[in-house]
Amino acid sequence: MLNEQTSEKLYQMKLNGMAEALKDQLAQPDINQLPFDERFSLLVDRQWTWKENKRLDRLLQNAKLKLNACIEDIDYKRARGIDKSVILNLAGCEWIRQIQNIIITGPTGVGKTYLACAMANVACRNGHSALYMRTPRLLQQLVIAKADGTYVKIMNKLAKAKVLIIDDLGLAPLADSERRDLLEVIEDRYELCSTIITSQLPIDLWHDSIGDPTIADAILDRLVHNAHKITLKGGSMRRKKI
């Protein structure tokens, strides 16, 4: 009865991992042979693991990644222009701590979105928040937000994500309001958080794609100068891993 009460109190205090570990210990006939400090250490370790798993689940859920992509699943044998040493170096997340960006370019279907989501996934596993947005949807949401009064809220959300994926930049010409909204998003994050950009267009065509020379200069200056650039090549691998 006492053990049941203790377990229930642990659950009420949201120490679920510790409560589950206690149940496991009580189910072992020889558990009393372990010293108290060892048993307690096992309880704490389980609680720590439970808490970290919950945090990762929350980060991944909030990230809304388009693909369930993992660095470990990347196939380097295919001729896609993926340098394994570069990817493994980025997987250490130092680029996030240094507030650097990643730009992934290449034709459709070569795995740009997969690689971007894999980078965001490993960022979440290292405790960083992330958020995935396709460029058309991002710009559409900002238009709606201006109309319904949630613009500031959405801009704050975009600004606070430690890693923001802006997928498919340059798919279509930008209207003047869209250029300005994109600049505001980039400006709010500049030298504060990291951004991953994917695009079918090579970087040297972005200026013309964005349109207005002054705004294009401002966007590119904030995105490109401190970015790790990855250029993918080859045919479409749609519905396949990289």
Each model region followed by its residue ranges:
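Conserved P-loop
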Residues: 82-160
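Conserved phosphate/pyrophosphate-binding and hydrolysis machinery centered on Walker-type P-loop NTPases
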Residues: 12-15, 29-34, 46, 64, ...
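Walker B motif beta-strand of ABC-family P-loop ATPases
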Residues: 163
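Pre-Walker A (pre-P-loop) alpha-helix and adjacent loop at the N terminus of AAA/AAA+ ATPase modules
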Residues: 27, 60-61, 65-68, 72-102
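Intrinsically disordered, low-complexity and often Lys/Arg-enriched segments
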Residues: 1-8, 240-242
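Interdomain "pre-motor" coupling segment immediately N-terminal to P-loop NTPase/helicase cores
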Residues: 11, 16-67
